[in-house]
A protein has these predicted regions:
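Hydrophobic transmembrane alpha-helices and their helix-loop junctions in integral membrane proteins
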Residues: 1-165
Length: 170
């Protein structure tokens, strides 16, 4: 690839990890989701920067699936803030008793965005990883490594609120 392609791939890997790391550290519910968006939009840039048909297909799939999942998560966060005034992750404890449907929808969205098999988030991340591997390049492997590390961080920052909603007392 060209230097511009290499730069785009490196920058996308950096922002995937930066967004995920910042999301883990963020305690404000909606800001955590915003950092997650930075990371996930970088997945799209990574896939498109591969400059292959499968990379572009993966980018479009993740664009669609991420949009559907993330709007669901933001709607849940907004509903929590409007109904309870709670904005911090630590304040979500016991919320499933007050807003069971909202918490259930958030949890389904979270496990999908984490990349749980058979859910949309898994499909698009699988397509991105497969497209990166198909390139047979070192940068493709760097992209796969960034995706795998980010998947672990995504589980941490999205399941933290869910665990608090269900398993921490009021």
């Amino acid at each position: 690839g060209t230097w511009a392609q290499t730069f785009a791939l490196l920058l996308s890997c950096f922002t995937i990890l930066f967004g995920s790391t910042m999301a883990v550290r963020e305690q404000h519910f909606k800001r955590r989701l915003a950092y997650s968006t930075v990371s996930n939009l970088s997945y799209i840039v990574l896939a498109a920067s591969l400059m292959t048909q499968s990379g572009l297909t993966a980018a479009l799939a993740h664009m669609l699936f991420h949009a559907l999942i993330k709007i669901t998560l933001f709607f849940c966060a907004g509903a929590v803030m409007v109904k309870t005034g709670r904005t911090q992750i630590e304040d979500l404890r016991g919320l499933s008793r007050v807003m069971p449907f909202t918490c259930a929808v958030y949890t389904v969205g979270a496990i999908s965005l984490m990349g749980t098999p058979l859910l949309p988030g898994f499909v698009s991340k699988w397509l991105i990883g497969s497209a990166a591997i198909e390139t047979g390049t070192a940068m493709g492997m760097v992209g796969v490594a960034a995706l795998l590390i980010s998947a672990v961080l995504t589980a941490i920052y999205l399941m933290g609120p869910a665990m608090s909603m269900y398993f921490r007392p009021l």
